[in-house]
C-alpha cells in the first residue's frame, strides 16, 4: 500500500472530485490518497464520491483555509 497526494486547490465543483476519481483509478486497492481542496462544496462532494465508489473516507481536516481529505481506495469500484 502506498500514499499519494493530489492538490486540487483553486478548482471549483465538480473538478476536485473528477480529478480525484481519475487519480483513484490509477491506485491499487488499499492505497491512500490525500486530497487538498479549497472549494467548500468538496466536503459534501468527496463524501458522496467515496460512498458511491466504495472508497473509505478516513478523515477530513481543515488546514489553513483548505480541506484535507484522506481516502483509502476500496477493493473494487462499482
Language model: regions and residue ranges:
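Right-handed parallel beta-helix/beta-solenoid
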Residues: 1-7
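Amphipathic, hydrophobic secondary-structure cores in small proteins
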Residues: 8-60
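Short acidic/glycine-enriched loop/turn segments that link adjacent beta-strands
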Residues: 64-66
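Core SAM-dependent methyltransferase catalytic element
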Residues: 68-78
Amino acid at each position: 500500500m502506498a500514499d499519494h497526494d493530489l492538490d486540487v486547490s483553486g478548482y471549483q465543483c465538480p473538478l476536485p472530485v473528477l480529478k480525484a476519481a481519475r487519480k483513484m483509478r490509477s491506485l491499487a486497492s488499499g492505497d491512500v490518497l490525500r486530497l487538498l481542496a479549497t472549494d467548500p462544496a468538496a466536503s459534501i462532494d468527496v463524501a458522496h464520491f467515496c460512498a458511491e465508489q466504495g472508497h473509505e473516507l478516513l478523515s477530513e481536516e481543515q488546514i489553513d483555509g483548505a480541506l484535507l481529505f484522506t481516502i483509502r481506495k476500496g477493493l473494487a469500484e462499482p
